[in-house]
Amino acid sequence: MFRQVSVRALRRAAGRSVCASRAQMVRHSSTLGGGKGSYNLDMPALALAAGVTLLAGYMVYPRAPKAKQAAVQSVAPVNENVEQASASLQASAPVQATSESAEAGEEEAYGEESGAVNEEAAGEPEEAAAEVGETQAEQAPAVETEQAAEAEQAAEAAAEDKASAGEAAQGQQGAYNPDTGEINWDCPCLGGMAHGPCGEEFKAAFACFVYSEAEPKGIDCVEKFQVMQDCFRQHPEHYAEQLESEEQAVRETEAAAESAKSDEGH
């Protein structure tokens, strides 16, 4: 509205200026025919008219299409930005879904691994207990065999002790007089062992056995019998029979020990 009013006012002013200029030009042109008058043109009025005409043209030129075009151009990038944002959201949605599914798969795999580890940890004590039971079951026969071998050796040693004690007892019955408490070293039952190279050692061992009050009888005379056996080995020509009996007893003891070891190996 303001532009229309301004344009109208400028047109009126321009019209008045042009009319005034034409009137002056008519007045002065009448003098040209006789050559007496001079051609006088009002230049300020023409300049004002030209300026008003240019300003009117500038004011009349439509500016709305440019503004509309600028508005359309400004709206287009906004629409493009909205479309790009929507496309980005749509593209990010599958990625987010994929990442969530991947995380869910990792959690499930971790849960399965944890369950497997727990099962293995729970199974280890049972396996260890089973192995201990098998080891004990395998060791039990060996222990029983070893105990049986030890018992057998003890029985053999006891039998040997009984045999020696029996011989000593037989000699004691003939050589020892319980009424007087004396020992007859010349008794034939002693086989002359009291008068040989190891007679003193024999007497010490025999007397220890006769007067022993330990249980079993003669158990406190082992050292004296050992001294007597050592003396026998130093004089094999006189005590061959006794040494042979001793060697036989040693062989039997070694055989029993080897048999026990072979049983343990099986």
UniProtKB/Swiss-Prot annotation:
A motif (Cx9C motif 1) lies at residues 198-208. It is found in: Mitochondrion inner membrane. Residues 87-180, 242-266 are annotated as: Disordered. InterPro entries: CHCH (IPR010625), CHCHD4 (IPR039289), GCK_dom (IPR012891). GO terms for biological process: protein import into mitochondrial intermembrane space. Residues 248-266 have a biased composition (Basic and acidic residues). It is a single-pass type II membrane protein. Pfam families: CHCH (PF06747). Cu(2+) or Zn(2+). The CHCH domain contains a conserved twin Cys-X(9)-Cys motif which is required for import and stability of MIA40 in mitochondria. This is Mitochondrial intermembrane space import and assembly protein 40. It comes from Eremothecium gossypii (strain ATCC 10895 / CBS 109.51 / FGSC 9923 / NRRL Y-1056). The gene is MIA40.
